Amino acid sequence: MKTSIMSYVAASALALAAFRSAAGLLDNAWIKGTTDKDPLTYRAGEEIAITLTPMDIDGEVPAGEYALELTRSDDYGNFKTWTEPFTGAPHVYRTSLDKPGFVRLEAYVLGPDGKRVTKKFTGDATTPEGKKAMNAFEKAKKAVFFDGGAGVEVEKLAPYAEPKDFDAFWTRQFARLDKVPVAFLEKVEVPQRNPRTRLYAVSIACAEGIRPVTGYLSIPVAADEGKKFPARLETHGYSGNPGFHMPGGWARETEIVLNINAHGMKLPAFGATDDDLEELRQSIKSNGRSYAFDPVQNADPETAYFNGMVLRVKRALQCLKTLKEWNGKDLYANGGSQGGLQTIWAAGCGEGVTRADSAITWCCDMHSHADRLAKKASSGGWYIPWTEAMGYYDAVNWAKRIPTACRTNITRAGLGDYCCPPMGLAKLWNSIPGSNKSIVWVQGSEHGYVPPQYEGRDFKKGIGK
């Protein structure tokens, strides 16, 4: 999730293409993982068979030189690591789990030196295409690995109890917005590449004491002729060291788009300087911790960093609904990781979102993260320390309040993503009311990595399955 983590997925795909001219034994290689049935349908105590198939090895693997490092873990703190010979042939691992939850299997190829193999870029970096491929390769994970697993009786997974005054708390918070009229504080047209749209840098008034909503608003030129359009809110992933929010190339002539940052930062179009950016970076930290991670700040739901973020999301939707160019019916929200969390907030905050597309949703059932850390069933540092106040921001609790009229899509849930663990995503899915929803579980997918497409990778549940 750190700095442009969502771009790693695209980088991985580009890097794979770059490997095709590789000469090294494993510079093209990756490991495909498949289960003997739909990985979300195992029952307690049932054997789970995961087949690991090495792909795109360039030659024969020398006998006795390489090993496969395997780690089996689960949501309950069970953990085991061992090695087996790596021959390039498929490997079947069998396990089970006696209660609802997920089993995780990690596999890394070790080289003759006993260290994890690191793939090397072997393309031609002297051409523009080659340089682009090399840059993508540098951003991608370079190990030869698999990270995935399977779920057991996932339909039984239920979240930690929500705060008893959840709705009353948010009624009070939203009343703070009601005291401040929806209005642009600043709106400046900025250059962009699509002549059929206009793009504006905007600052929108938020609640008193809260930084404004800032970002970029694109409106189709055809609106000048009286045409009306759907409106979309786009939100961002996490960056503990944010850079300037710059205009992107996403302006579309088919819909209105408001692309906002998490912080209400000053934009370059409004004269933002390096000093302004550094001031923001320092101000969003708390007690030496990156924003939103300070348990002292998070002890009170009103002082939690997420409080202002939620209010900015709701105000952004309110602003979209005031635009004369909006068609008055289609209101969308989308984002990934932290943006996926904000998308769930958007869908559940009462502004009438009609479609929400949330990928690799962060902060689902955060209480279980505390258990995971205590049992050392964790990898990565992306679990916010639990306080009871975090229950007011947990994606699972917001999901319960999504109207059934809203089409809610969890567009990617990685079975190897332990930044946003599968257990939390399953609880999110179970908490969304009704049947107007879908989720795509992706085998072998980490937070910033999706393996190449193969049969047995994707499993869609809900509408359109």
Regions found by a protein language model. Name each.
Residues 86-88, 114-159:
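Short beta-strand elements
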